[in-house]
């Protein structure tokens, strides 16, 4: 069995500053790039499939050459066998639709059709959640979203998934789909390794991946638009039908503090402060 996990590099909003140009496009400046945190459940799902069903795991991303570090991190997370980076200027500034076209073409260009493609439910910089479903549409594959648990039957060529019903976090439905299929994981996804052999396989794969991740560039294939035979008019900024009408900062609510002024020279008031602090600290 072969799986592909899609991941993306996003600005580390804890470090540096980002801005937007006059067309509403994100300018990262010197802000560091990190792996999209919402991709982690997808990586866990792919790792579970590899441990329990065998086969190979690949990771694919679209972005600038600097995304190699993001792919290395993903390789360590999913114990990936190989990496794919889709990268050139023609692909830059793509919206979700142009991204989906590019990524779907990259998947179709692989030497072997994968059985499963995994994606996180949204990116930290875009927040739309469109790219995964749109990529599934371009591939013309079954799509299962909000997945929290997964079992794959390679002999039957099917997957059985538990998914959260949108709008009701307490309701879970079980669905079945034929392979190949596209899976969008929910943040609540947790892998399951019920058998001892699965846990041993997990340990062995971790040891194998340590050396491979240290030489991740030797296991990375980089494709530009010409390698994928993509028309520049249908990818990147030129192929993006989305128009950003404006970008507005989210106003921060004013901090509310319920403060009490005390006289530090008044023993009774200070004793009251000590009592109050003791209550918060778990005292009597």
What are these regions (language model features)?
Residues 149-284:
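Electrostatically charged, flexible surface regions
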Residues 69-102, 106:
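A glycine-rich helix N-cap at a beta->alpha junction
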Residues 126-146:
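Short Gly/Thr/Asp-enriched flexible loops that form oxyanion-binding sites at enzyme active sites
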């Amino acid at each position: 069995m072969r799986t592909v996990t899609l991941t993306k590099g996003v600005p580390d909003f804890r470090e540096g500053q980002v801005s937007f140009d006059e067309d509403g496009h994100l300018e990262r400046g010197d802000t560091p790039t990190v792996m999209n945190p919402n991709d982690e459940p997808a990586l866990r799902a792919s790792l579970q499939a590899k441990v329990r069903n065998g086969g190979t795991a690949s990771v694919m991303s679209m972005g600038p050459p600097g995304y190699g570090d993001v792919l290395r991190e993903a390789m360590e997370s999913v114990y990936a066998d190989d990496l794919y980076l889709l990268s050139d200027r023609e692909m830059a500034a793509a919206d979700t639709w142009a991204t989906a076209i590019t990524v779907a073409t990259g998947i179709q260009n692989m030497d072997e059709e994968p059985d499963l493609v995994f994606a996180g439910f949204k990116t930290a910089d875009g927040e739309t959640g469109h790219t995964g479903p749109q990529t599934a549409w371009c591939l013309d594959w079954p799509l299962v979203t909000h997945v929290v648990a997964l079992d794959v039957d390679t002999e039957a060529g099917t997957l059985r998934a538990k998914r959260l019903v949108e709008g009701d976090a307490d309701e879970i439905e079980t669905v079945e789909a034929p392979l190949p299929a596209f899976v969008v994981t929910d943040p609540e996804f947790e892998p399951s390794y019920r058998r001892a052999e699965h846990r041993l396989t997990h340990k062995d794969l971790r040891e194998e991946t340590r050396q491979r991740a240290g030489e991740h560039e030797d296991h990375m294939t980089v494709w530009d638009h010409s390698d994928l035979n993509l028309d520049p008019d249908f990818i990147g900024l030129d192929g993006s039908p989305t128009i950003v009408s404006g970008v507005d900062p989210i106003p921060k609510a004013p901090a509310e503090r319920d403060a009490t002024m005390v006289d530090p020279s008044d023993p009774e008031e200070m004793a009251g402060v000590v009592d109050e602090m003791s209550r918060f600290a778990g005292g009597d």
